[in-house]
Amino acid sequence: MKVILFGTGNYYRQSKAYIDMTQVICFVDNDPKKTGAMLDGKKIMTPKEADFTNCDYVLVLVMRYQSILEQLSALGVSRDKIKLYPDLDDLFEVKPCICSEGKQYDFTQWAANRPEKKVMLICHELTRNGVSVVLMHVAQVLKRMGYCPLMSALLEGELLEELQENHIDYIPQIHLFYGGRQFADFIGKMEFIIVGTIGIADVVWRIAHIEVPVVWWIHESNDKDFHDFPLLVRNNVYYYAGGKRVVECFKKHYPYLSVEKMLYYLPDNRVETKCRDAIFRIGIIGLIYPRKAQDIFVEAVKKIPAEKKNAISFEIVGKYIEPVIDMDKVLKENPEIQYIGEMSQRALNDYFAGLDLLVCPSRDDPMPVVVTQAMQYGIPCIVSDQVGQSEYIIDGKNGFVFPTENIKALKEKIIYCIDHKDILSDIGQESRKIYENYFSVEAMEENLLRIEDRVRR
């Protein structure tokens, strides 16, 4: 077998351990700066220089491969000659493993030692993003119900430690083999599969033919995602939406498909609430990038009169992803604002125990976990009308809602809370009822029982 590898970046570096370089003719890359260089003993060529008639397959090791497919088609390469990175297992010997209780097992060993009914949960990465954490919590509920859950993701990350602590088995990186025969055979042993985001649509398209029930739990509520990641119509694919806003966006694009609303479960892991000191703490928590609207929060804080900011700490918590605010400038010009950075879940629980008010001004946020966590702690929340929990909030009774990107309205809500600290405890207790009614373990068990009934029909 002779193979040309298209791509020399991150996906090649992750794949190279499995690739037999004696079968590789050359690399192809669109970056002119790499042309002519040698990589692992093979020359890097431009697409026009490579002789694709001299190979059996072209293996595309690029994440967004659609433009590469079009490019290869224009060069006369037939589609059946092209393999994508999830097909690596079809060309080379890939030995995926499952991590369980500190040990590694191949698919056959793991399945043989698990007599329980098995459910696989798939997300895009095993990091502390909302969807991955939510799926981990579902895995915990499935264990309570007698299932053997198995977490998997395209990429691994910092969630691995928590999976180990919770005794949840996982496959750390399926992006190199989810299109291959081994994975297809293994999927067939599952009772059903839960896929946690629209962004890994390609995985669903690859596994749906196996006829195992696929529960596609979509959490996105913007038109671009529904345009970029097409859904499919199959009898074994069941659609669920993580809130009212997701349902509305789903039906806008797919009015002919059935979809049911299913909210996530959040474990009640509250730590003891700290004694309040003289400082009134207002926090915004989440990845720092435009969708989370930290810029709106900062601008609202800047417009609050100075005399209202006495003994107030405005705190930004989260990992900096994209420039939405100039953090150094913000901190220098606004001493009442603090940047705390990213927190583990354990640290975040401790943080919530001392927080007085949460602000979530997101431009688009179907059902942010941090808002539910605040409600769990009985912390009053100010959210934009583009935040999913807003559908359960009665303004001024169990929280506060303002029009998205309306800096003046957010400023007024914050000032109201500063001026009426004496009623915030009651509002927080009312917000706790939202958590109990919609996000508890009992609610999730009922959801999973309904899924069981639906997929067995």
Regions found by a protein language model. Give the residues of each.
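Nucleotide-activated donor-binding/catalytic signature segment of Leloir-type glycosyltransferases, i.e.
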Residues: D326-M343
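Aromatic "clamp/platform" in nucleotide-sugar-dependent glycosyltransferases that forms part
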Residues: R363
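Short alpha-helical donor nucleotide-sugar binding micro-motif in glycosyltransferases
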Residues: E342-M343, D350-L355
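Glycosyltransferase donor-sugar binding loop
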Residues: S152-G157, I285, S313-I325, G341
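A short, well-ordered alpha-helix in the C-terminal region of glycosyltransferases
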Residues: A409, Y416, I423-Y438, R450
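Short hydrophobic beta-strand element within catalytic cores of glycosyltransferases
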Residues: S152, P380-V383
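Conserved acidic donor-binding segment of nucleotide-sugar-dependent glycosyltransferases
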Residues: D395-G396, F400-I407, Y416-K421
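A conserved mid-protein helix/loop that constitutes part of the nucleotide-sugar donor-binding site
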Residues: N129-H137, Y289-K303
